[in-house]
Amino acid sequence: LEGYLVEVQSDVAAGMPYWEVVGLPDLRVKEAKERVRAAIKNSGLLFPSRRIILNLAPADLRKEGTYFDLPIAISLLVNFGYVKKVAKDLAFIGELSLDGKVNSVNGILAICIEAKKLGIKKIIVPKENAKEGAIVSGIDVIGVENLSQTINFLNDNVVIEPETVDLQQMFYDDFISDVDFADIKGQSSVKRALEIAAAGGHNCLMIGPPGSGKTMLAKGFASILPELSFDEALEVTKIHSIIGKLPKDKPLMVKRPFRFPHHTISVPALIGGGKIPKPGEISLANHGVLFLDELPEFNKATLETLRGPLEDREVSISRLNSVITYPCNFMLIAAMNPCPCGNYGSEETCTCTRGGIEKYMSKISGPLLDKIEVNKVKYQEIKKDTKREKSEVIRERVNKARKTQLERYRDSSIYSNSEMTPSLIEKYCKLDERSENLLKGAFEKLKLSARAYNKILKVARTIADLRDSKNIEYEDLAEAIQYRSLDRKYWKN
């Protein structure tokens, strides 16, 4: 999501009419010649017949897209004498229509952030993108509607005030969800597991028969997700803006994304890629949730590609001359039946063979399972109409726990317990002797991996945070261990 500054250099000389663009432009950049020529003419200006050479520096980096139309036009207009010399700390971005209108482009937020880092003080962008760019403080964002207005602004014939936005108003947004946890009957232990997952950013797998409410619980999970911090909101918005999925009426995304891809999804669509690399579903779920329903129905090779991103929280896409890295710090919430027929462990009769169940479960590999906290939906719980808490009440507890974590990790580059490194685990997950013995016994009995050992401590830390406790108690650890015990039941017995 990082960029670089491109300087548009133009040389206009007498001679046979000729126009060449150099500096590794792609086809869309080369096509800018015709758009720019028409836009200048249709803005009431003469386009002289000259020999024109345009260089996009640095020349060793490929230039793609229609972002360069407006800066190319301004560079030529300065050479033609229609516009006075442009300041070094002023940048331009925008696509031109043939009639001179400045059209919106994708990725303005990321562009403005990078422009500020590179010392740009003012940037001229399409009017439709101005609100998005104005989210970045410390840089003046000027929105223009057409080329004529841009020329008049540069020549001091008109005044255009920098765009402003009210960030507090953007975050003041009533939370609306299609499913409230209070609408879901029973399932208290599953709701508890999902509350822990939301509070600590942990991954969760729900196993249960068809009709037990797994999908509804996952959709309800969106209603208890913690608020986005401003830095998280910026990162989420950048990714959606780059691929044109940012709502026009919402220049800043203030709610955590919830992505729900179909089980037929391809690897590039899930992970990211393509001829022109784009973020995949895991990056669109950054700082939010990726929900995979009917997990074993996904292609096994597709699921295995999640292992690296789940561990690294970023994904790299290699191309011939470059490597593009996208963030993918998401919570994985998955759901599946306990067997092919779906009735294993329920009150209904299971018609599957032992071999059939083992083959079905083997679609989820051990290394992938190690990255997921596991829970089981018990059929009997559906009939228990226990006290139902509203999502709003649960969300308050989740927000409080997340704020505790943000304060704890304020000097680190992480946001939640699930992101703790081994050194942070050692620092913040200290156990007393009784708890140490419990964990040692569970580790040996369940034959857990070293990664699972750390996962238990991370979950225990979150459970303690929900109690607003500085220390992990024996009961916190015992509850965390139970979320690891079910994976061995289903994958070993």
Residue ranges and their predicted role:
Residues 22-33, 48, 55-65, 276-277, ...:
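Basic, amphipathic alpha-helical bundle interface domains used for macromolecular binding and assembly
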Residues 158-196, 200, 227-282:
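P-loop NTPase nucleotide-binding/switch module
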Residues 287, 293-295, 305:
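Walker B catalytic acidic pair
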Residues 47-50, 86-87, 117-119, 137, ...:
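Short loop/turn elements that form and flank the Walker-type P-loop nucleotide-binding site
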